[in-house]
Amino acid sequence: MKAVACGGLWLLTAAAFAADTVAFKFDFGPGAVAPGYVQVLPATVYSSALGYGFEPGATVTGVDRGGHDPLRGDFITSDRPFFFSARVPAEGNYRVTVTLGDAAGETTTTIKAELRRLMAEKVHTAPGQFATVSFIVNTRTPQIAPAGDIETGEVKLKAPRESIQEGWAWDDRITLEFNPGAAPGRSCVCAIEITKVDVPTVFLLGDSTVCDQSREPYASWGQMLTRFFKPGVAIANHGESGETYRDSLGRRRLDKILSVMKPGDTLIMQFGHNDQKQIAAGTGGPFTTYKAEIKQHVDAVRRHGGIPVIVSPMERREFDENGRIKPTLADYAEAARQAARELQTAFIDLNAMSRPFYEALGPEQSKLAFARPAPDKVDNTHHDNYGAYELAKCVVEGIKENKLPLASCIVDDFGSFDPVHPDPVGQFDLPASPFSTIRPPRGN
C-alpha cells in the first residue's frame, strides 16, 4: 500500500482507499432512508444482537424536516450529551464521517470517541447549514497476536478499572459521544459512516497524565491530542493510570503495541510520576533502571520499524514563595533527556514546558488547570480539560520542533503554541462529559 503526504506526506492514495470497506452507514431520523443506509430511530438501543444503537440513558428525539435529501432532511437531536455505538469487525483504525445540522435551526456539537477522546470541537451550523466532519478512531482488544519476537497472549488489564469503568477502550465497538454543551445548545446528527482504513498510527504510552481518563473532572493530554490531527493518522492511547516503564513491559502493553505496529508508525511515551516511587521502595532510580527501561522501549520500537519519541514528565503543581514551580521531577526529566540524547531519539521536554505554563497562570489561577473533584480540593498532579488541552498543545509543538513525519498531519488551525502565553483559562469552554467521579486516578 502506497502512502503519500497528509497534504504532503501521509494520506493514502485513492487506489489505497479503494481497498477500504465501509463497515456501517447510518441514516439518523424518522424520515425517508437514504439508499444504502441503515435507519437509526430514537428507540434504537444498542444490543449485541443488533450491533449498533444508542447507549442506555440517551434522551434523544427524531425530527423529519422533509425535502428531497433523505440524508439531511431528518436527524436525531438532543440538548444533552448522548452516546452511540457500533460494533466493528476487527480492531484497528476506522475513519468516522459524521453529518451534522438542521434545515431549520442552529446546532452545536462536540464529538468525543471511546473514553472522551476529543475528535471534533464545538462544530456550529446555522439554520439550513450542514457540516461533515471526519476523524480516525483506533479500536483495540486485549489479545496479542504473534508478530516477530512477540509471543501470543493478552494485555494484563487492571480489573475492574479497565474491564468495567474503562471497558469502552477495549471492546469490539466504536462509541461516540455527541455533546451540545450548555443550554441552549443542541446536537443534530444526520448520518454516520464508519470505514476501516489503513493509516499510520501514533501510539501513546504513559501514566494517568497521558491515558484516556474515563470520568470528569480528570483529563490527560493524550485524550486531547486527537483534536490536533487530520484524519490521515490515528492516535492509539495505550497509557494507563498508576503505571511505569516497568509496568508497560510487565503488563505487556508494549508487546500489544509492537504486535500491531507497522513500519513508520510512532510511539510517544511519557512516564516518571510513578517510576519515582521506586526510589523509596528500593527498586529503581532515574539514572539506573528508568533509563535502562527507556532504552528497552526504544530498542524494541526500532526493531519493529517504528519511530520512538521520549517525553519528559510534566511537573506537579507546587509553587515556592516566589511564585515559581518547585522541581519535583527534575531527576526523571534529566534522565529522559539523557536517554534521548544517548539513543539519538526525538525528545519533547514537557517538563520544561509545563513549568512556565503553570507560572504564567500563577499560584491561584493554575488551580483551574488541575482536576478539582470537590469544591475545596485540588489534585496537584492530574489535570482537568483545560490543563490537558494546553499540555496537548505543548506536545504538538514538540512534534513540530522535532520535525517528525506526523507533523504534516497537524490541523491547519493549530498554528503554534508558547506555554508562556497559554490560552486564557476564562475563555476555555470544552463541554464536559456526563460521567464524573471524586476518586483520583491510580498512582495519585
Q: Locations of the language-model features?
A:
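N-terminal secretory signal peptides that target proteins for export/translocation
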Residues: 1-2
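Short, flexible loop segments at the rims of nucleotide/cofactor-binding pockets, characterized by
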Residues: 74-75, 243-248, 324-326
